[in-house]
Amino acid sequence: MTWTTPDLCDRYPDAMIAEPLFRHFGGRTAFAGPLATVRCFEDNSRVRELAATPGDGRVLVVDGQGSLKHALLGDQIAANAVANGWAGVLIHGCVRDVEILATLPLGVLALAACPRRTERRDLGDVDVPVNFAGVPFVPGHWLYADANGVLVAPQPLALDGAGGSI
């Protein structure tokens, strides 16, 4: 890894920083990429659908409206996300199968763990702006996460004087 969120914050003081609400559950602590979004409530139908599509290094941001009653991501959907090239998942809600999530090469941030799965009712919105943890998450914006926190920017951030970016 050639970047940290503290270094990015120092270089880009206007970057948006998410409130420190999230715990790491995945096997990858640091991850970054353009974001895709899902808004849902206790139904992971859209999360499952997106994880089955090419991720191309994107980060899936799921606004589960902070529900702690059902897990929106488990080992099967996470393994599918890995197989399809997703860099990570940020969930404003819960995950389950945490022992397995920790072994996968995927960034996973969530509020907590909950063993109960969702009921799939085919509900939820895809690629809509969502807002939680004090940050607007807009499809196509970039998310950077590591052990220090979560940063969001409207474009990829340059990391050197030559204009290189993540």
Swiss-Prot record:
Catalytic activity as recorded in UniProt: 4-hydroxy-4-methyl-2-oxoglutarate = 2 pyruvate; oxaloacetate + H(+) = pyruvate + CO2
Pfam families linked to this entry: RraA-like (PF03737)
Uppermost EC category: lyase
Keywords recorded for this protein, A-Z: Lyase, Metal-binding
One annotated GO molecular function: ribonuclease inhibitor activity
Cofactor(s) needed by this chain: a divalent metal cation
Disulphide bonds in the chain: none
EC id: 4.1.3.17, 4.1.1.112
InterPro entries: RraA (IPR010203), RraA/RraA-like (IPR005493), RraA/RraA-like_sf (IPR036704)
Transmembrane portions of the chain: none
Binding positions (a divalent metal cation): 97
A biological process from GO: regulation of RNA metabolic process
UniProt remark on cofactor binding: Divalent metal cation.
Positions with a binding annotation for substrate: 74-77, 96
Assembly information from the UniProt record: Homotrimer.
Family: Belongs to the class II aldolase/RraA-like family.
Function (record text): Catalyzes the aldol cleavage of 4-hydroxy-4-methyl-2-oxoglutarate (HMG) into 2 molecules of pyruvate. Also contains a secondary oxaloacetate (OAA) decarboxylase activity due to the common pyruvate enolate transition state formed following C-C bond cleavage in the retro-aldol and decarboxylation reactions.
NCBIfam families, per database record: NOT-MenG, PRK09372.1, PRK12487.1
PANTHER family: 4-HYDROXY-4-METHYL-2-OXOGLUTARATE ALDOLASE 3-RELATED (PTHR33254), REGULATOR OF RIBONUCLEASE ACTIVITY A (PTHR33254:SF29)
Name the UniProt record assigns to this protein: Putative 4-hydroxy-4-methyl-2-oxoglutarate aldolase
